[in-house]
Amino acid sequence: LAAKDNNVAGLLIAGEIEAGIVQLNELRQAIVKFKESKKPVIGWIENTSQREYYLTSVADKIYMHPASEVELKGLASYNMYYGEMLKLFGVGVQVTKVGKYKSAVEPFLGDKMSEPAREQTTQLLNGVWNRLLTDVSVSRQVTIASLRRAADDAGIYNAEKAKSLKLIDGIRQRDELITELRKIGAGADESGTSFRQISLAKYAHKVQLPRRGERIAIVYAEGEIVDGWGGVGEIGGDRLARDLRELRADPRLRAVVLRVNSPGGSAFASDIIAREVGLLRNKGIPVVVSMGDLAASGGY
């Protein structure tokens, strides 16, 4: 929508963001689509984390504050193990699990990661890291090998070094960034000291989508799956099943997008939800599942 909006001169990627790699990748894809409009996309770095840089790297130009740093250090997984400590207190743990890769309970059983858990974690991290490097390489027009060296050599870089590594395009103070943004068409704000801007959240709120006619429902399944109704941040099996049942009865419904971001949980609640999804499909209503950062166990 912003790509077609004549009131939008361009896009600025800046600030902190709390999101997983999957969500950031989806944002990157949306920005790549926005760039087809030929409107400029500018990235701004002030002490940026690796995840934030991954998103920012999609910009046409990236500017960095001279006193800030940027991370590019690779991925790692750290786990705590309590098995030996529990034994000291006379606490025994009995677990029933299916398959050698079901590692969620390992922290309560021993004092180190099992080889199957290490194998699957390593494979996951390598896959995500390779995707991240590939995306940054394409956006920044640098080799994957050079990005690997940057991550191995230090992992955190100041502005001058980041520029020499081609992680950024230029070094600017905040007032100089404002000047750059005005050059690409951003008008001055009411105070005359900054530029006219609107956040993504406020822009999405202002945009009016059609409310009549046929519908596609977007259902969010976010959090741990629990029996019953569930609370804030949980997927209650009964509650989500009821929502899906009500959608099935809506004559205007043409499809359902089920957004899953869950580590799993209750097998019973998961089965109740899966049954309602199946009934939607049996009625001829397409169900498209969009997986977020987590779609594990019952979530899958």
Task: Kindly label every feature range from the protein language model.
Residues 154-157:
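Extended, domain-scale alpha-helical bundle/helix-rich regions
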Residues 175-183:
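A ligand-binding cleft/hinge motif common to bilobed small-molecule-binding domains
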Residues 1-152, 182-289, 293-300:
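Small-residue-centered hinge/linker elements
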